């Protein structure tokens, strides 16, 4: 099954979002709400354009992508910014790409988590675990890049 082509502006916007989110997550362990809100607004405008992916597809993908990782937030394993980042990425990729994106991000996150656990394998208190939480924006970026490489039509 091949996925429908995604407009170049969506890939460009997603790439810029992920670069800025990774930078902020690594530097401050936060993904700023204004970044996500501006990108979500741009994603909705892109979706509504005649060549866009469609508002219904975009909104459904945001629910799928954000909802897929919501249990990890509820268990305290991810931050709210990571969930909002996934939902915003969903707005940009639409359905059915959001399903493949979630799988790619989950696999990248699992591999990064193994490396993170190996690096920080000393026993820690609960407060130290919170301060030493893995910046999941990196996993979202790597998973998105992997997804893009697997699904982009190359000549």
Language-model features, listed with the residues they occupy:
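A membrane-topology feature that recognizes alpha-helical transmembrane segments
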Residues: 1-155
